[in-house]
């Protein structure tokens, strides 16, 4: 469109959109945006106007003291490219087998220290409540919500949750792939051993509600989820999953991911309790398939209970010891799909519009639904 007019580069335009907002960018160079075929003006405006949040994004950092804080990562640049306003910045402690008491706690503290320094390098602050999220969005400043995937670091010590809270933790994934030293509940990919939520897991949920930490029940089996919902006094999130009817085109991936998907019945239970469920990018080979997976979940539990939770990485993988990680298609947020030409949230908004979502609906799924439960959870302590 209007290709004879002077234009900015795509990077210059996307930066302007993120920093100044769509309206300001157009005022600075009103024709430049539409000279870039990849960015539709309606998409750009929605991205600028909404608080786009990925509720489960892995940022790999070192967990051993000799490697803290790791190589510089361009988190700010990746976030601006993506169009996201915020991410729930998470990491896991059990990728390398935990073998002794205290090891998970040490990894957790090293991970937080690494993240402290990486955030400082990037000029990014943690959002501790909804007011922080809204202020960062108003200032066009990327922000993060500190998360952890799995309560392995607790090791039976309730007081460690308070320590984590004071270090900025506001989103706790109760479980991950392996059982913690002091278990919190049954993991959906492991044989059930504990009858659902354990007594210590119940204590942790109560303490999260008291302190003001959002509880994430991803990786929990049905019995654990049911017990947690009966106990919780604030809404919860299942940050990354997909409806078990949406299996995609890759049969191998479908078989592997099937235990990690949520049934219609369980999704309704979470929604009826006021919770939200994040749809991941797995099992979606194209942005349109991803938007269709979002639509499938919306059709089951309603527009007010669905959010985005990619289970991807904005920044490169970190391999302990300096090893090489080749990565794979779909691993990085801004490269979620083959031949993706624009940042993640721009791509998703475009696909959602093409799938029939309204601007208001995109705003809810993009971030408003998460903001509602995050606000309710962090109201435990201001």
Residue positions per predicted region:
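Loop-centered beta-sheet repeat module
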Residues: 194-229
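A composition/secondary-structure signal for short, hydrophobic, low-basic-content segments
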Residues: 1, 52-54, 236
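N-terminal hydrophobic targeting/anchoring segments and the immediately downstream early-domain regions
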Residues: 8-191, 244, 252-382
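N-terminal secretory signal peptides
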Residues: 1-9
């Amino acid at each position: 469109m209007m290709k004879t007019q002077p234009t900015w580069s795509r990077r210059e335009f996307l930066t302007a959109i993120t920093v100044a907002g769509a309206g300001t960018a157009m005022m600075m160079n009103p024709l430049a945006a539409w000279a870039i075929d990849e960015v539709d003006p309606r998409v750009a405006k929605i991205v600028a106007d909404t608080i786009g949040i990925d509720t489960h994004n892995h940022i790999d950092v070192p967990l051993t003291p000799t490697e803290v804080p790791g190589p510089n990562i361009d988190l700010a640049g990746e976030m601006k490219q993506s169009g996201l306003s915020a991410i729930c910045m998470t990491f896991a402690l059990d990728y390398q087998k935990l073998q002794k008491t205290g090891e998970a706690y040490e990894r957790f503290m090293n991970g937080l220290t690494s993240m402290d320094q990486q955030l400082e390098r990037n000029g990014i602050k943690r959002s501790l409540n909804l007011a922080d999220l809204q202020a960062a969005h108003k200032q066009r400043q990327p922000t993060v919500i500190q998360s952890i995937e799995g309560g392995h670091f607790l090791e039976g010590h309730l007081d460690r949750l308070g320590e984590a809270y004071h270090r900025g933790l506001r989103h706790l994934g109760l479980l991950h792939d392996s059982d913690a030293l002091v278990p919190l509940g049954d993991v959906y990919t492991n044989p059930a051993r504990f009858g659902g939520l354990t007594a210590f897991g119940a204590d942790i949920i109560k303490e999260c509600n008291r302190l003001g930490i959002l509880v994430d029940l991803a990786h929990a089996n049905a019995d654990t989820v049911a017990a947690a919902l009966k106990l919780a006094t604030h809404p919860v999130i299942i940050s990354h999953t997909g409806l078990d009817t949406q299996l995609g085109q890759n049969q191998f991936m479908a078989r592997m991911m099937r235990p990690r998907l949520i049934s219609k019945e369980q999704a309704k239970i979470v929604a009826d309790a006021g919770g939200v469920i994040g749809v991941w990018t797995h099992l979606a080979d194209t942005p349109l398939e991803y938007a269709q997976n979002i639509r499938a979940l919306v059709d089951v539990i309603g527009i007010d209970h669905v959010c985005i939770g990619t289970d991807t990485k904005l920044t490169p993988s970190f391999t302990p010891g300096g090893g090489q990680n080749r990565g794979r298609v779909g691993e990085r947020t801004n490269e979620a799909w083959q031949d993706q030409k624009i940042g993640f949230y721009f791509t998703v908004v475009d696909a959602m519009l093409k799938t029939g979502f309204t601007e208001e609906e995109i705003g809810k799924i993009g971030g408003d639904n998460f903001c509602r439960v995050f606000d309710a959870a962090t109201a435990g302590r201001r």
